[in-house]
Every structure is written in structure tokens, then in C-alpha cells.
């Protein structure tokens, strides 16, 4: 079975333009992501999907494979679907281009559900929430699932709502596991044939309310399998986030 990791990479960004090419210890960020994705045991090949020639040139310079995509795509899923239509992969992994510290093991963890169960169209990851700040923050997407790992809902709101313990919420309750809740890790794995189906679905009510594209899948009755991971990464949305990445690398 052929498994391809695709890294959608845009140059334009409201908070950090050109972040895909941001220098991290002598290499562009997109190269760090590419090299880490290539180390995943289950991944057969890695492709960067971009509509920007500057990013494409940088990828070619370090010997990576790049696919040019339409500049009119509204979402990363649309860009991914375009690439998936051009390749012969059975499974396509969407690796975020702004995750230079992603652990290759995370990618393997997210892929396995699709290898174990051919009826699953899509999978993703979650990790434990360990601070009250993350639990309350609308920038941290929470997720709940059933006992077999099927996602029930994603939300920017606190999820679940601990009605009887709301006034006693403290960091130590999350660290100890007394209050068990999870945040979504934005790594997605798809069966190739499901990507055009997903891309062809119209935006849904809950998706538009929460501004979470993955809710479109649930609202249309498709399953998303979710796996808990112990690994955490740092998404680079701002120059300040890049500083955190550099500090983490210096500590290693």
C-alpha cells in the first residue's frame, strides 16, 4: 500500500508572510517538515504542494518533490485533493507545513487506523490538555470521541463542560488526569478516494460557526477515527512561535 505525505505550503499568511521559508538553523521551515515526514516508517513519499514559485524553488534546492497547485484554492483540503488526483497513493497524509518539530511517530500513529480498518475514510490525532488556559482558549480546538475512537465533536469551546466542577478548575486537575479532556492535533490522514468527496461537500452550519473544516465531515455522516498521541509539536503562526521553536531546538 502506497502512502504519500503531502505538505500544503502557502507564501501568503496574515500573521507571518513567507513562514514556509523562515530560516530555522540554516534551513527553511518547509525543509524541516519535509525531512521529518520522510522519516515516518509508513510513509512512501513526501510531496510539497504549493502555488508559489519561491517555495517550489526552495524545495527543489534541497532535493524535495514539489507539485504546483491552483492559486484559487480556498482550503488546504482543496489543495490536497488536487495533488491526490495526480498521484497513485492509496492513503494521503496532510502534514501541516508550519509544524517543523513534528515527530515522525505521530504520522505513523495517525496512519495505522486506516491500515487496520478499510471502512475508515479519515483519521487524526489528539493529545491530553494539561492546562486550564488551553481548556478555555478558543485557539485550542477540543475534541471528544466515543470509546472506540470515533470523533463525536470538535469545538473551540471548553469540551466537555464540567458542570459540577466548573468553579474548581485548576491546572493540577488536568495534569493529574482528574479532569480528562483532549485537544485536537491537526494532522489528517485520508483514503485517496475520500479526498474528492470531502472537497466536494458544501460548507456546513457547524463548520461555519466554529470555523473548523473537519466538522463538515461529521455533519455529512462520515466517520473520523482519532488516536491519542503523547507527542506535542509547536505550530508556527507568528514570529514569536518561531522563537519558541528555535529555543526548543537549542535545548536538544
UniProtKB/Swiss-Prot annotation:
Localization terms from the record: Cytoplasm
Gene Ontology cellular component annotations, sorted alphabetically: cytosol
GO biological process: CMP-keto-3-deoxy-D-manno-octulosonic acid biosynthetic process; lipopolysaccharide biosynthetic process
Pathway involvement of the protein, from the record: Nucleotide-sugar biosynthesis; CMP-3-deoxy-D-manno-octulosonate biosynthesis; CMP-3-deoxy-D-manno-octulosonate from 3-deoxy-D-manno-octulosonate and CTP: step 1/1; Bacterial outer membrane biogenesis; lipopolysaccharide biosynthesis
EC numbers, comma separated: 2.7.7.38
Alphabetic keyword roster: Cytoplasm, Lipopolysaccharide biosynthesis, Nucleotidyltransferase, Transferase
Main location per the UniProt record: cytoplasm
GO molecular function per UniProt: 3-deoxy-manno-octulosonate cytidylyltransferase activity
Catalytic activity from the UniProt record: 3-deoxy-alpha-D-manno-oct-2-ulosonate + CTP = CMP-3-deoxy-beta-D-manno-octulosonate + diphosphate
Claim: Cytoplasm is one of the keywords in the record: yes
InterPro entries: Cytidylyl_trans, KdsB, Nucleotide-diphossugar_trans
Coiled coil among keywords: no
Task of the protein: Activates KDO (a required 8-carbon sugar) for incorporation into bacterial lipopolysaccharide in Gram-negative bacteria.
PANTHER family given in the database record: 3-DEOXY-MANNO-OCTULOSONATE CYTIDYLYLTRANSFERASE, 3-DEOXY-MANNO-OCTULOSONATE CYTIDYLYLTRANSFERASE, MITOCHONDRIAL
UniProt-recorded name of the protein: 3-deoxy-manno-octulosonate cytidylyltransferase
Species: Geobacter sp. (strain M21)
Gene: kdsB
Amino acid at each position: 500500500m502506497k502512502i504519500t505525505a503531502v505538505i500544503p505550503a502557502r507564501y501568503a499568511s496574515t500573521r507571518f508572510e513567507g513562514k514556509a521559508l523562515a530560516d530555522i538553523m540554516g534551513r527553511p521551515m518547509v525543509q524541516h517538515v519535509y525531512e521529518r515526514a520522510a522519516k515516518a516508517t509508513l510513509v512512501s513519499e513526501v510531496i510539497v504542494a504549493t502555488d508559489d514559485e519561491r517555495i517550489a524553488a526552495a524545495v527543489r534546492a534541497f532535493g524535495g518533490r514539489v507539485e504546483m497547485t491552483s492559486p484559487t484554492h480556498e482550503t488546504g483540503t482543496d489543495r490536497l485533493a488536487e495533488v491526490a488526483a495526480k498521484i497513485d497513493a492509496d492513503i494521503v497524509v496532510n502534514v501541516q507545513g508550519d509544524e517543523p518539530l513534528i515527530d515522525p511517530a505521530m504520522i505513523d500513529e495517525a496512519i495505522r487506523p486506516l491500515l487496520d480498518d478499510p471502512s475508515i475514510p479519515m483519521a487524526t490525532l489528539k493529545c491530553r490538555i494539561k492546562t486550564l488556559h488551553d481548556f478555555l482558549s478558543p485557539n485550542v480546538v477540543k475534541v471528544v470521541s466515543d470509546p472506540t475512537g470515533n470523533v463525536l465533536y470538535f469545538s473551540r469551546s471548553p469540551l466537555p463542560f464540567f458542570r459540577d466542577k466548573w468553579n474548581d478548575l485548576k491546572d493540577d486537575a488536568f495534569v493529574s488526569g482528574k479532569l480528562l479532556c483532549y485537544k485536537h492535533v491537526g494532522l489528517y490522514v485520508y483514503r485517496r478516494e475520500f479526498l474528492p468527496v470531502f472537497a466536494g461537500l458544501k460548507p456546513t452550519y457547524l463548520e461555519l460557526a466554529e470555523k473548523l473544516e473537519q466538522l463538515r465531515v461529521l455533519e455529512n455522516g462520515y466517520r473520523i477515527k482519532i488516536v491519542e498521541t503523547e507527542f506535542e509539536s509547536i505550530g508556527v503562526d507568528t514570529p514569536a512561535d518561531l522563537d519558541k521553536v528555535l529555543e526548543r531546538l537549542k535545548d536538544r
